[in-house]
């Protein structure tokens, strides 16, 4: 029984620490996690800001997630060249998605989630 519990704990730890990339043509580390500056372009702009993920549009006034305005950001997935989200780096305390960008005052986002963050002021 002890070995099974230990194996399940290791499996859960492995699952929580891996970063999956579900966007087509993702480079190593994720589409928006490229820091070398080579072959990277700015992510496309949406109705009131910048696309952060396939369903996330953020600007100075906040973020829209899953709305009609943010649906244009899905086109970003069709481009094989990785893009760079403007904004300082921030850390989220979500399993698997720890590196994000400050995209709006008080908001830190990755390509699939956003969270309030005191470091993004």
UniProtKB/Swiss-Prot annotation:
In the UniProt record, which is one GO cellular component term?
A: extracellular space
Domain of life (superkingdom): Eukaryota
As stated in the Swiss-Prot or TrEMBL entry, residues carrying the post-translational modification 4-hydroxyproline are: 27
* Chief subcellular location: secreted
Q: Does the keyword Cytoplasm apply?
A: no
Record family assignment: Belongs to the vasopressin/oxytocin family.
Protein name, per record: Conopressin-conophysin
């Amino acid at each position: 029984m002890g070995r099974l519990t230990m194996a399940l704990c290791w499996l859960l730890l492995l699952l929580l620490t891996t970063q999956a990339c579900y966007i087509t043509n993702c480079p190593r580390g994720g589409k928006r996690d490229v820091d070398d500056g080579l072959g990277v372009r700015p992510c496309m702009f949406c109705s009131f800001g910048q696309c952060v993920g396939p369903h996330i549009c953020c600007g100075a006034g906040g973020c829209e997630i899953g709305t009609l305005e943010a649906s244009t950001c899905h086109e970003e997935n069709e481009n094989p060249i990785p893009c760079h989200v403007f904004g300082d780096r921030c850390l989220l305390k979500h399993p698997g998605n720890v590196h994000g960008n400050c995209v709006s005052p008080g908001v830190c986002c990755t390509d699939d989630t956003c969270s309030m963050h005191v470091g993004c002021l």
